[in-house]
Every structure is written in C-alpha cells, then in structure tokens.
C-alpha cells in the first residue's frame, strides 16, 4: 500500500462514514506541522487515536505524534510496534 497524504487519508475515512468536526481537521494539520511528522506517521497517529479513543482526541493525537517523532519512528509498522511495547494501546 502506498502512503497516502493526510488529506487523502482523511477523505478515505470520511468515505467510510467517519466525520471529523472542522476544528479537528485544523488540529490534525497543526499537530503534523508542530511535530514536523511525515504523512505516514501523522496518518498512523490519527488511526491509533481513533482506535484508542473511539473519536478524535486532539491531545491524545499530538501526544502520540510527539512520542513518535522523539523516538525517531518513521513507519506505520514501527509506530504500532512502539505502542505495543510501551503498552500505550491494546491493539
């Protein structure tokens, strides 16, 4: 699977019926730029936030992004391994 841009990923989620409030979309881009995270890591943080919280939680999302960037995590696979190892989520 090729990496989608954040915009493409959000459109994909919307096509599956998930609706983001307008402020959430802005916050997603804020977090991406604030942490200088790649699209792949940003999308993974969105995915894991939704799985853990069952809705978009901006502070949880930014916290994940910060952890991923601080630990030099660059792929979805590595991000999922990281949250499993740190027991941040039960996935």
Question: Where in this protein do the model-derived segments appear?
Answer:
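Long, charged low-complexity interaction segments
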Residues: 1-37, 76-77, 84-91
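Amphipathic alpha-helical scaffolding segments comprising HEAT/armadillo-like alpha-solenoid repeats
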Residues: 41-43
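Short, cationic/aromatic linear interface patches
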Residues: 45-91
């Amino acid at each position: 699977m090729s990496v989608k841009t954040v915009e493409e990923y959000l459109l994909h989620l919307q096509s599956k019926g998930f609706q983001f409030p307008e402020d959430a979309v802005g916050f997603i881009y804020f977090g991406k730029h604030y942490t200088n995270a790649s699209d792949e890591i940003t999308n993974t943080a969105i995915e894991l936030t939704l799985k853990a919280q069952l809705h978009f939680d901006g502070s949880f999302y930014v916290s994940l992004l910060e952890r991923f960037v601080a630990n030099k995590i660059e792929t979805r696979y590595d991000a999922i391994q990281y949250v499993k190892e740190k027991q941040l989520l039960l996935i």
